[in-house]
């Protein structure tokens, strides 16, 4: 056979997008994406896409903590305290961070506490140290009164059991890793393939092996380019030894690489020359699906499935290799759920309009965590304290509020925003939900929506606002706050989901009630039923149920399924003060497959929540 006849020219070039789409379809048929999932230590999971939805299993914090250095007190003892009329308290102990004071304090007593220290069981406020003065080894003068719960981080104020910590396909940014660690989680499932890189070519010499290659030889350089670019993604990369242009050696190198890796990259041997053997090996070993891309440089690119694994052949010329990696290989890996961080900066800086008023701290620039919604450049700052790592991890940006502004930043004002991570393409805006309802919603969207989801669980008024601006793809709104929904009917499809709300009470050390954000239906109800009681702020029914169960509050407002959980766990039956029938309106943008979303959502409601939620079609 002549040299000419042994060549196999590349005749049919494929568009990059078509090649990627075709490969994804073929790889999905063999369950390839699932094979890329690895359970790894949190330290190894940074910047990876999570392969599971993780719900909070404990409250954070799980005990009352001080958020300042000062003195834990009974707020009742300081009602009359002022600069002119200080109150003398007896100092009965000290608690450092990491410690817990297990004894109750008596009338007129206090305990010194560090920031983060646990409070005595019946302490209900903390006086900052700057408002006090020592009057002896066991005496403290207090020059200010404090309110119930002031400077206290209540249990579940950051995360409650059943909260979503990470949604499947979320990129595990550093703050999300910290939120997982705060749950006691040390390992997590992520998409993190093992990749082997094999340079080929009889002409190649390993850098450092000789002072200068002999004529005809060159230093191998492309593997350094390939490895360093791939390592901007969530992968484990190993580079093999240089393989000469010998069919048997290439076959053996492929066999070795397939044993321990999910994906194999060959460099070189992909063109039509007599010594280009990689494409011949792939043709005989598996299914060669791509041979030639319609790009320059980079035409001689290969892709094959061998032993149910992905093998890619890159051109040998380094510039071609670079172009194919950026235009084809890395986009293909991203479609396989492998996250790449190729931008030069972790943060991007934009200006956006405030969805709600915002207030800077007095005398300081305030960097407030927020939800950035890039569909129309809006930003929604959240209420938070600096210990709230879970709340922080659920946002995707920070708003800068400059010091020196008197009063509030008004709605619609442009503010500088630092956005971190990738843009969220699918917006879910929701009323605060029970743990079971939340799980039903998340399970539905995980199974159907193949986009990055931003879950904004900030109450019905926020959800309605985002729906009116056509920002929310899914909005879940309480019937008590759903005025004006008719105007959205041409843009959203909808269903109604019935839920029963109960106001319950029990005996507790303090007559206190959970107070919800005013943006939620729970806030409206708590305004009515918590009058005359001390107030403990909560965000969700999940947090309220935990505090009620543990006796931190004597009254709360819950969806009935959370009450069932309280009764079954504690064995006592709370007193029902009132029952309220409510309906959640679930809105779905008409450009989505709402029929499928609603069908799956209702099935999940039925399987997760039992008979407590009854779906009704609008």
Tell what function each PLM region has:
Residues 426-432, 506-528:
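Short loop->beta-strand "edge-of-pocket" segments that line small-molecule binding or catalytic clefts
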Residues 2-17, 186-314, 318-328, 443, ...:
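Helix-rich terminal scaffold detector
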Residues 496-501, 568-600:
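Periplasmic-binding protein-like
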Residues 13, 17-20, 32-43, 47, ...:
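Flexible glycine/proline-rich
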Residues 445-513, 541, 557-563:
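N-terminal segment of the mature folded domain
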Residues 381-385, 391-396, 403-471, 511, ...:
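N-terminal hydrophobic or amphipathic helices and topogenic motifs
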Residues 242, 452-459, 531-544:
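Short beta-strand-to-loop elements that line the ligand-binding cleft
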Residues 2-16, 71-244, 255, 377-386, ...:
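Short, glycine/charged-enriched hinge/interface segments at domain edges or termini
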